[in-house]
Swiss-Prot record:
SUPFAM superfamilies: Pseudouridine synthase (SSF55120). It comes from the Bacteria. This is tRNA pseudouridine synthase A. Belongs to the tRNA pseudouridine synthase TruA family. Its EC number is 5.4.99.12. One of its GO terms (biological process) is tRNA pseudouridine synthesis. The gene is truA. It is an enzyme of class 5 (isomerase). The lineage of its organism: Bacteria, Pseudomonadati, Pseudomonadota, Gammaproteobacteria, Lysobacterales. One of its GO terms (molecular function) is tRNA pseudouridine(38-40) synthase activity.
Length: 257
């Protein structure tokens, strides 16, 4: 058996999320596995670096799979992509060792959240942008966000459905920047809880509108009470930028540190 790592890009708008959930609806996982199976002429199961929810997009999701069939990387890339819908594409393929694991070998994961901050909702690229009509203070949001850095208990920002054994995560970097009418929030952590990014964004938006002071974010973190935090932000503006791996795995630069 040969193990391969793939970099996968997808528009999550038409999917119920990454994970295959029986017959409930289309998933990125099932769609990718079906295309890979056609190339391998055998069933294929993929393991991803980070599962995404319904409507969340993937810029460079990393997966691994095992196959008894040997194909050159170009064949896996082109053969699989031609069998995928236009919303999913395989960007790269790297043969790797059986010790590599898309999830457990990753040392960090990155997300980006983008929203349009103007009076009128977006018509173009609306599936990739959230929207907030009230003026936002991006600098206040950025300062408040820095209070979340480090290893902390993020219970205030986890969903009620989160199945993680504990809520401690290391938030390694977070920034809030304005580019004309677009606010961009970038987050990196060793791992994330269910809805963690969207819940953080929802609370930062309340700081941005002036509804809450910057110090409120630190109070939420210390309080560990989800019911006291802001609402969950829309999935529409969220992109899983991708995981990061140690250089020893010899993966493309965009996912290596």
């Amino acid at each position: 058996m040969m193990r391969y790592a793939l970099g996968v890009e997808y528009d999550g708008s038409e999917f119920l999320g990454w994970q295959q959930l029986g017959e409930m609806g289309p998933s990125v996982q099932a769609t990718l596995q079906q295309a890979l199976a056609s190339v391998a002429d055998a069933s294929v199961r993929v393991v991803c670096a980070g599962r995404t929810d319904a409507g969340v997009h993937g810029q460079c999701q990393v997966v691994h799979f095992d196959s008894a069939v040997t194909r050159p990387p170009r064949a896996w890339i082109l053969g699989t992509t031609t069998r995928l819908p236009s919303s999913v594409a395989v960007r790269w393929c790297v043969p790797t060792s059986e010790d590599f694991h898309a999830r457990f070998s990753a040392c960090a994961r990155r997300y980006r959240y983008r929203l349009l901050n103007r009076q009128v909702r977006p018509a173009l690229q609306h599936q990739f942008l959230s929207w907030e009509r009230h003026p936002l203070d991006a600098q206040a949001m950025h300062v408040a966000a820095q209070m979340l850095l480090g290893e902390n208990d993020f219970s205030a920002f986890r969903s009620a459905q989160c199945q993680a054994l504990h809520a401690r995560r290391e938030l390694q970097a977070i920034s809030v920047r304005r580019y004309a009418e677009v606010i961009e929030i970038c987050v990196q952590a060793n791992a994330f809880l269910h809805h963690m990014v969207r819940n953080i964004v929802g609370s930062l938006l309340m700081v941005g509108t002036g509804e809450r002071p910057m110090e409120w974010i630190a109070e939420l973190l210390a309080g560990r009470d989800r019911t006291m935090a802001g609402p969950t932000a829309s999935a529409r503006g969220l992109v899983f930028v991708g995981p990061l791996y140690p250089a020893k795995w010899h993966l493309p630069m965009e996912v290596s540190v």
